[in-house]
């Protein structure tokens, strides 16, 4: 699969002067709820109305969606509110039903993207379709799986493709529900610059208070659109209540986002420069996050050394680390001088932290 300009044609056809906005409830709950939200979104920047009908939940016993009956409600949304409709599909049966009700946009969820078997089943069921098909990143940070999903769909003669970045699961404590790991969608964008890239800040955040910040970062990284879970009564939503916002809040949030526009070669240069600088900011934050984790491990080592009455400085171990890192640095185009300075500073901070533990 090669990046082609026509991959963006479905997005260009919207002729928008703002990022694409996909919004609607995490789950369709009742017909009244679905239509009420749709009416509230009708005269906003929202182009596509989303609602989950089949909900793949982590554990059984939780609300798993209303199922096929919700397709009738989405049909009413299209006819009465004039919005395009979107829902998640996880197997060939879902695809068949969604196509029967003329759903405009189908997305493959994170739990499905991890399985080539599921993606292939969906691709076979969608073969030759002219519907817009979006692929969410897999649950785990694996770019090959994400690209593999796109390639299977492309091989089934599906040309209207896009990707949704919803973050990645992690065992580590984080302010995010799913860590953004921005470097992965950036890498995908670098390889396939013509595939529309949409951010799902709702699933990255898992809470309302950081939705705008995540959305702004996505736009600064040149994402083409946002998918935001929206509900008229989010606190009482049947699923993912904490991350949903009202249509009014969505409108205010969109008004508060800074959206860059290109009007000249100079603007194009500034846009590209801003995107690259944002990428550096994301990477720098990742470096600090990693260094913080490293220092926590160093403190744990200090506690163990204190318990066993072992000296802080272990010269043999330090020389091994330095030698290995210099070799690794050379492979990545980093000079020996730079690697030495950096790891000496890191090592000194580790020693300082361990000495604090031992002397406490």
Give residue spans per PLM region:
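Catalytic beta/alpha-barrel core
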Residues: 66, 82-91, 95, 104-118, ...
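Hydrophobic faces of well-ordered beta-strands that scaffold small-molecule active sites
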Residues: 20-25, 47-51, 85-87, 106-108, ...
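Glycine-rich, proline-tolerant flexible connector loops at the mouths of alpha/beta enzymes
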Residues: 50-69, 232-241, 301-310
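Catalytic alpha/beta core domains of metabolic enzymes, predominantly
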Residues: 14, 118-249, 256, 262-268
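N-terminal small/glycine-rich loop or linker at the start of catalytic domains
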Residues: 8-26, 57-60, 189-199
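Active-site mouth loops of central-metabolism enzymes
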Residues: 19-36, 60-65, 84-88, 109-110, ...
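Extended, charge-rich alpha-helical interface modules
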Residues: 259-360
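N-terminal amphipathic alpha-helix/helix-capping segment at the start of soluble metabolic enzymes
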Residues: 1-22, 76, 255, 265
């Amino acid at each position: 699969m090669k990046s082609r300009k026509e991959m963006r044609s479905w997005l260009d056809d919207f002729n928008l002067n703002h990022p694409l906005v996909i919004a609607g409830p995490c789950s369709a709950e009742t017909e009244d709820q679905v239509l009420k939200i749709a009416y509230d979104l009708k005269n906003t920047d929202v182009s596509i109305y989303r609602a989950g009908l089949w909900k793949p939940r982590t554990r059984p016993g939780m609300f798993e969606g209303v199922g096929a009956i919700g397709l009738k409600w989405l049909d009413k949304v299209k006819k009465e509110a004039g919005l395009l409709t979107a829902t998640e599909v996880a197997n060939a049966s879902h695809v068949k039903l969604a196509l029967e009700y003329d759903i405009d946009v189908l997305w493959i969820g994170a739990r499905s993207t991890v399985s080539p078997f599921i993606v292939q089943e969906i691709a076979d069921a969608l073969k030759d379709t002219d519907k817009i098909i979006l692929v969410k990143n897999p649950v785990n940070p694996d770019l090959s799986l994400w690209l593999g999903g796109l390639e299977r769909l492309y091989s089934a003669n599906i040309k209207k493709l896009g990707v949704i970045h919803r973050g990645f699961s992690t065992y580590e404590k984080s302010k995010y529900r799913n860590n953004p790991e921005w470097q992965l969608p950036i890498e995908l964008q670098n390889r396939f610059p013509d595939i529309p890239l949409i951010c799902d800040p709702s699933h990255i955040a898992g809470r309302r208070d950081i939705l705008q910040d995540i959305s702004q970062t996505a736009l600064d990284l040149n994402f083409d659109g946002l998918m935001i879970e929206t509900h008229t009564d989010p606190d009482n939503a049947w699923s993912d209540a904490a991350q949903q916002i009202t249509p009014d809040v969505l409108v205010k949030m969109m008004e508060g986002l800074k959206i860059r526009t290109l009007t000249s070669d100079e603007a194009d240069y500034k846009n590209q420069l801003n995107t690259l600088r944002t990428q550096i900011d994301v990477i720098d934050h990742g470096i600090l996050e990693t260094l913080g984790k490293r220092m926590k491990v160093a403190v744990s080592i200090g506690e163990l050394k204190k318990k066993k009455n072992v000296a802080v400085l272990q010269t043999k171990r330090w020389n091994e680390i330095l030698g290995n890192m210099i070799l690794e640095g050379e492979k990545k185009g980093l000079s020996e001088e730079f690697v030495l300075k950096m790891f000496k500073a890191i090592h000194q901070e580790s020693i300082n932290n361990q000495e604090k533990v031992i002397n406490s």
